Each structure stands twice: as structure tokens, then as C-alpha cells.
Amino acid sequence: MDFTGRNKAIDIIRALTMTLMIFVNDLWTIEYPKWLGHAGMNEDYLGLSDIVFPCFLFVVGMSIPYALENAFKKGRTGVQVASHILTRTLALIVMGIMLQNTGNIAPEVGIAKPVYKLLVLASFFLIWNIYPRTENKNRRLLYKVLKYVGVALLIFMIVIYVDPKGNLIRAGWWGILGLIGWTYL
């Protein structure tokens, strides 16, 4: 089967799902009808919020053949594609764990929660930003230094983290990004 063209149905489902993801992620900030939220553990129904992530996973699954064919058309080998998948998986899992822990940092660390979260997010951008390709050696060196600064910052943020009970960073819940990372495999 040829997967070279855009599939409008997948694009439409992706757009609707992304819109719903933004919407349901902000529901907690307002009063809303019960059916828009998540069903409770012992409730027998699905709220709108309960179907958004499965829809996202469906769209991801439907897009995989297109992404693989596109990668191979660009001349990537199977090893390069597998390496890309593993790297992205690790990145999403690390992001998920870090973001889940940022809201529970102990005051003794000496960094306010919002500042800690901003520094963690800055490290993500420095590490996983797709820097432009260039022939300029100084520019390439700058991009490499920025990535190393991001890695050092992320390691520092992991090392200094302590929650109010004295626990170090841990994966109590992977967070939505971590879950996406695991399903990416």
C-alpha cells in the first residue's frame, strides 16, 4: 500500500483530538458538566476526558506507516529509525517523570516550584530542540554547547530534587508524556 499522500481522515481526527486535549487539560480550572470529566473509579460510564487519550493513541497508530515510509524515503536505515524511536521514547519518559515531580518539590531545595519547573522545561528545550543544520562551525559548536548545557541543567535538577517527605525523584506516575513514550515503543 502506498502511504505517500496525506490522509485527510487522519488529519481531521488528529486536529479534533489535539483540540480536545487542550480543552480537557484545562477543565480543572472551571466548573463543567460531569460528562465532560473523567469517570470515577466505581462509576460505569466514559466521560469525554476518558476518550481523548485513546483517540490520540489511535491517531498515532494510524500515522505510523506514513512516518516509517517517509523515514525510509529520506534514506534512513532500519537501525537509524529504531534509534530515533528509542531516543524519542526515552525523552518522553524522562519528560513525564520530571514534570510529574515538579509540583512536589520541598521548600528546603531553595527553588520555588514555578522556577524549578521553568528550569526543567528550559533543559528539555536545550536538549531536544531541533537546531538548524548549518555549515558554520561556530554555529554548530554553539548548538552542541546548548545541548550540553541542557543535559547538565537537567542532571542538576534531578540531583537537587527532594520532595517534602525527603524522597528523591521517582516515577510514581509516568505523566501523560511518559505514557506516550511507553506507547511509542
Regions found by a protein language model. Name each.
Residues M1-T102:
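N-terminal signal-anchor module of multipass membrane proteins
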Residues N70-I180:
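Membrane-interface helix-loop-helix modules in multi-pass inner-membrane proteins
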Residues T183-L185:
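Hydrophobic, membrane-inserted alpha-helices
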